[in-house]
Amino acid sequence: MQNLTDSFVSLGHWPSAGSFGFNTDILATNPINLSVVLGVLIFFGKGVLSDLLDNRKQRILSTIRNSEELRGGAIEQLEKARARLRKVEMEADEFRVNGYSEIEREKLNLINSTYKNLERLENYKNETIQFEQQRAINQVRQRVFQQALQRALGTLNSCLNNELHLRTISANIGMFGTMKEITD
């Protein structure tokens, strides 16, 4: 106990800040207290340190297991992707081989349908031209007929006098009368 009291008393007397030196007094450095503290730390700290190391070990092992599982999943996905790639490459080769003949067939179909469309348009154009020509001819005929009729009426009007006009009307009435008797 005396030792303990002396320790507290000596704590109050610190060496001055200006001095520095080695303390060669073994009893003053208190190696027994230090060894006791180290012994207690080792005895009780071993369990805590062991638990910390075990926890760390478990986390590392679980991380490794997760990594292995992820690696396995990645390898599986890689194999699936390679299989899909092989399948797509085979389909692409098929399309390439079949595609050329399909393209040629489509090209010929397109050329044939374009030729038929052009032929149909040419026929439609010819029919339209014929229709327009016929309409123009009919308009010219109608115009010529109207002009001829107007000239004939003009000639008749200039040649007819009242007496000739009355005789023509009487002759026409007579013809209508005989026609009526024949039909009755």
From Swiss-Prot:
Superkingdom of origin: Eukaryota
One Gene Ontology CC term in the entry: chloroplast thylakoid membrane
CDD domains: ATP-synt_Fo_b
Topology in membrane: Single-pass membrane protein
HAMAP family noted in UniProt: ATP_synth_b_bprime
Biological role: F(1)F(0) ATP synthase produces ATP from ADP in the presence of a proton or sodium gradient. F-type ATPases consist of two structural domains, F(1) containing the extramembraneous catalytic core and F(0) containing the membrane proton channel, linked together by a central stalk and a peripheral stalk. During catalysis, ATP synthesis in the catalytic domain of F(1) is coupled via a rotary mechanism of the central stalk subunits to proton translocation.
Protein name in UniProt: ATP synthase subunit b, chloroplastic
Species name: Platanus occidentalis
